[in-house]
Structure formats: structure tokens, C-alpha cells
Regions:
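Heme-based O2/NO sensor domains and their adjacent alpha-helical segments
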Residues: 12, 21, 48-66, 70, ...
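Short terminal or interdomain "cap/linker" segment that borders an active site or interface and mediates
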Residues: 2-33, 37, 43, 47-54, ...
Length: 217
């Protein structure tokens, strides 16, 4: 069991307790297909590598996609400063809702805090480009999401899930426009890279939001 799974069990000890039958038979679990589905749901809820493997199988994320992401590394690295500046200094601090979490008690943009968050986002992107889809990486992704909710973050911090999805969608299209500009003369490479990043984004989004749904994960 991973560190994050162990922490989850401590946060929700009822999930770790042995389930005792109430005496009522659930006929659904007599159906082999439903029983297998339940076991898969249970196993992929707490074992982060099984969760990744299942999601990768669902979206058909393969070694070819990993190679495509590696192909995009030079483009990302060459434009990393511009990408981060755009996300933080053009999008986040100017959005009427998203910017709320980057303001001080007087409502002014807290530039030092923005710079800290920008540096953390850079670390996140660099870790993605390492293409190491191991337990350490996925626990890191989960932690990045978890600190945005009271479970593992600050008690008064809760970033609504739709804002996360909006920002991930924004980053997604920004990167794709960048790839389209850089690879306009190589449509096949563009297809490989954008397809791979799309699949990876959906897997990351799933793991990122695990602790948003802790009580019934």
C-alpha cells in the first residue's frame, strides 16, 4: 500500500474496517461480470499503480505514446518560460475567479506567491517530461491535487473541481496550439504528440482528483 493510500485509510478508517454482512444478499454480485467489475473498482481505488494501469488501458496509453511525449520535450523545454508566464501572468491572475487564490488580504495580487506557484508548476511539467510512470510519479500527481482540498492541504483551502478542469483544459489547448505552430510542416508528428498528451492529461486528471472524492472513492 502506498503512502497516500495509508494516509487515506487513516483519514477514513471505516474504509479499512472488515465489512460484515448485514444478512441481506446482494444478487448483483452473483453475476460474474458484475463481481469482476466490483473487484476491479475496489482494487483500482486504493492501489495507485493499478489505477494508472487501468486508466492507461482504457484510453490506450502505450509505450508509443510515451515516446511521442519524449519527442515533444525539446518543444516544451524551449518554450517553458513562455508557457508558464502565459498560464500564470496572463491567465490565472487575470481571471475573475481563478485569481482569487492569488490575492493577499487586501485583494492585491501576491506576486511572490504567484512566483512560488509558477515554480511548482514548472517542477510538475519537468516531472511529466521525465516520462517515469511509476508509483513515485503518480503519488506526486495525487499530492498536487490533494493539497487543493482540506484533506491534505490547508483546512480553509478548497479549489472547486470545475476550476481545475477549466485550467487543465486551458493548458491543454495552449500546448496544442504551441505544437501546431512548431510542427506545422510535420502533421504526422503533430498527430502523435497531441494524441499522446491528450491521453496522458486524462490519466493525470483522474489521479489528480482522487482526494476530491475521498468519502466514496
Amino acid at each position: 500500500m502506498s503512502i497516500m493510500s495509508d494516509a487515506y485509510m487513516k483519514m477514513f478508517p471505516m474504509e479499512a474496517e472488515k465489512k460484515v454482512s448485514a444478512g441481506k444478499r446482494n444478487p448483483v454480485l452473483d453475476v460474474p461480470e458484475f463481481n469482476r467489475a466490483w473487484n476491479l473498482y475496489r482494487d483500482t481505488s486504493l492501489d495507485i499503480m493499478k489505477r494508472y494501469e487501468y486508466m492507461a488501458q482504457c484510453v490506450n496509453f502505450t509505450d508509443k505514446d510515451t515516446e511521442a511525449i519524449k519527442e515533444s520535450k525539446d518543444i516544451i523545454v524551449a518554450n517553458l518560460k513562455a508557457i508558464l508566464d502565459h498560464i500564470y501572468y496572463e491567465k490565472l491572475i487575470n481571471d475573475p475567479w481563478l485569481s482569487r487564490w492569488f490575492r493577499d488580504e487586501n485583494g492585491k495580487i501576491a506576486k511572490e506567491y504567484v512566483d512560488i506557484r509558477r515554480a511548482r508548476q514548472q517542477r510538475f511539467l519537468v516531472k511529466i517530461l521525465e516520462c517515469k510512470w511509476d508509483e513515485e510519479f503518480w503519488n506526486f500527481v495525487r499530492w498536487v491535487g490533494a493539497v487543493h482540498v482540506p484533506i491534505f492541504g490547508f483546512e480553509d483551502l478548497y479549489i472547486p473541481i470545475r476550476l481545475n478542469l477549466a485550467l487543465w483544459g486551458y493548458i491543454h489547448q495552449y500546448l496544442f496550439n504551441l505544437f501546431a505552430s512548431e510542427l506545422k510542416n510535420d502533421p504526422e508528428k503533430l498527430r502523435r504528440i497531441t494524441t499522446a498528451w491528450t491521453k496522458l492529461f486524462w490519466i493525470i486528471i483522474d489521479v489528480y482528483h482522487i482526494d476530491y472524492f475521498g468519502p466514496w472513492m
